[in-house]
């Protein structure tokens, strides 16, 4: 009886671990979708509308900082459960001379805030001021080349006219309800 049980378990493991030829064939097919290509730069984001907005800024003559700002604001509109202006960010810029500069868009508490001895679990003591917009504004001031209103125009358009909510974002909204 023990031998039959052992043989059954080993057989199940063998067949469960063997390679699925159909999945292998499907996975080995190259993608025929061209997502983005550029000789000077490109944008990649978690949401195609945000990627398109950043790439359109590059095509209009903007630089990487401009594209990052446009992309960030579109993400805040079209994928607010994962990206937004009400949170924090860190930005790393490689400058033309090869050096790096960082922008810390972390949340902060007011300078006059006196923390309690025990960290609060609820109430105003648990809330900090978002740093995303301040960091993006500083990035723009130091590296941007296009007017701010041009950079946020795509986000305003999607917020005003609407857009198709992708499946993952819809699922996150449904989960929150």
For each feature predicted by the language model, list its residue ranges.
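Positively charged n-region of N-terminal signal peptides that target proteins for export
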Residues: 1-4
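C-terminal motif of bacterial Sec signal peptides marking the signal peptidase cleavage site
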Residues: 13-16
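Bacterial signal peptide processing site
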Residues: 18-20
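Noncatalytic scaffold domains of N-terminal-nucleophile
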Residues: 23-52, 64-65, 69-177
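Surface-exposed charged/polar residues within alpha-helices that form helix-capping/stabilizing sites
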Residues: 55-56
């Amino acid at each position: 009886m023990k031998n039959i049980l052992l043989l059954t378990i080993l057989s199940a493991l063998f067949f469960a671990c063997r390679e699925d030829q159909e999945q292998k064939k499907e996975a080995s097919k190259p993608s025929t979708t061209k997502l983005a290509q550029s000789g000077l730069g490109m944008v990649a984001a978690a949401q195609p509308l945000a990627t398109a907005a950043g790439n359109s800024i590059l095509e209009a003559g903007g630089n990487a900082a401009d594209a990052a700002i446009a992309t960030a604001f579109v993400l805040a509109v079209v994928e607010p459960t994962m990206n937004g202006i009400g949170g924090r960010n860190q930005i790393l810029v490689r400058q033309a001379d090869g050096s790096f500069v960082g922008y810390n868009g972390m949340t902060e508490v007011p300078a006059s805030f006196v923390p309690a001895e025990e960290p609060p679990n609820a109430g105003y003591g648990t809330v900090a001021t978002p740093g995303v917009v301040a960091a993006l504004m500083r990035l723009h001031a130091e590296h941007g080349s296009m007017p701010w209103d041009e950079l946020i125009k795509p986000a305003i358009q999607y917020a005003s006219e609407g857009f198709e909510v992708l499946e993952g974002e819809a699922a996150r909204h449904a989960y929150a309800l």
